[in-house]
Amino acid sequence: MKKIMLVFITLILISLPIAQQTEAKDASAFNKENSISSMAPPASPPASPKTPIEKKHADEIDKYIQGLDYNKNNVLVYHGDAVTNVPPRKGYKDGNEYIVVEKKKKSINQNNADIQVVNAISSLTYPGALVKANSELVENQPDVLPVKRDSLTLSIDLPGMTNQDNKIVVKNATKSNVNNAVNTLVERWNEKYAQAYPNVSAKIDYDDEMAYSESQLIAKFGTAFKAVNNSLNVNFGAISEGKMQEEVISFKQIYYNVNVNEPTRPSRFFGKAVTKEQLQALGVNAENPPAYISSVAYGRQVYLKLSTNSHSTKVKAAFDAAVSGKSVSGDVELTNIIKNSSFKAVIYGGSAKDEVQIIDGNLGDLRDILKKGATFNRETPGVPIAYTTNFLKDNELAVIKNNSEYIETTSKAYTDGKINIDHSGGYVAQFNISWDEINYDPEGNEIVQHKNWSENNKSKLAHFTSSIYLPGNARNINVYAKECTGLAWEWWRTVIDDRNLPLVKNRNISIWGTTLYPKYSNSVDNPIE
């Protein structure tokens, strides 16, 4: 028996330095008063023993939260603008163009599980945070519950992390402890795995929307857009007048996600001393059900505003080409749009400096902005850029339902044109050239004015040339010419009778030949699309 005891004590003494060495190594990686366990944690932290009164409090919390009666589809809703009147169509002259502006009522309905993060609220955003699912969350100002917390398990999705190195247990899930735990996970990867994975490509999340109203863009990108637009400064006034086209792009480069293990019961997220009455006093009820931040994406967030004063219907295609880097060398119109457009970028993260970058430039430089921060390393640290929330009652995903009506404004430019007359025939000729000019009354109805050339039906001898300048709102152009044959039975003979011609930049009408064999041509230089 004594021999057995000696063997047992010897084994304990041998193993003790090893345990101390392991403990010291973990403490050097992170030392926060044992708030975080750096050992490889289980899938979820084990529940610590509770006293009878603590178990009673936990059961009451579970019963209360699980008994909250609410429709998860109606809790988080953003209602934007309601459009009742659509402004009428209008037209106006602008230099050598006639601009037609049209308005249409549109609506957008967007379900957003990811909530964007901007610097103003990043301090409130951390994995496992307990929040109220209410209008404050919809407005991206989460109302964090100030209660004692129990432990939780975090995991990170950086590549190569084995033996549960990608997990960590936070014993007291306060904001500072959780953020320190995230830093510990990232540093663990940098020290042990970064060399094997030197170029971790960011996961790309891309979304875009042509801009028409702030309410529309909030419905598209979430209420974080309000803060972003303080820097982007989308020109809604010029867009509404049809003088500008702008697109907003959200470009996320996600380096890694930190996830929280789902609690097996609501009370597992609270400290032992927390009671149902405390939660009720903090306003937790069916109108403000509790939720938790279940996942946070860390990386680089780029918001872009692309701008042009072009009225072309190909602006969206040009913007898409500029962002993707697609060559447009074979398309003159797209090339000109890109050449004469600009961008503004608001960038969060991806820099060792903890600051927001604002960059202005031409579309030709846009790809360089997007290529930066394409991979994760120490020099391109990630910041919180988006988070998701789950209801604490049942771990169901909390989705924000955004909707808004807005006025879509489109404009089209009609460039002024010209008809060039050239008469070189051996006869007397008379022309009759007419067209309609289109305008709009205050209700948006078309007003058609018929116009005639001042030299209509006047005899012209060869060689006669003239140019007729037509405004951009000219339509239904008719060109007629006749020549005098000298024949008693056919004194006038038609040379050309072309009707309902479209407006073009240069239309060349030529007549020539003899009285008996007149000829003509109708050709176009630089047609207007």
UniProtKB/Swiss-Prot annotation:
Protein name per the record: Listeriolysin O
Entry's Gene Ontology BP terms: killing of cells of another organism
Subcellular location: Secreted; Host membrane; Host cell membrane
Motif Conserved undecapeptide: chain residues: 483-493
Annotated control of activity: Activity of listeriolysin O is regulated on multiple levels. It should be high in the phagosome, thereby allowing escape of the bacteria from the phagosomal compartment. Then, once inside the host cytosol, the activity must be controlled to prevent lysis of the host plasma membrane and loss of the intracellular environment.
Record GO terms (molecular function): cholesterol binding; toxin activity
Keywords of the record: Cytolysis, Hemolysis, Host cell membrane, Host membrane, Lipid-binding, Membrane, Secreted, Signal, Toxin, Transmembrane, Transmembrane beta strand, Virulence
Signal peptide: 1-24
Organism: Listeria monocytogenes serotype 4a (strain HCC23)
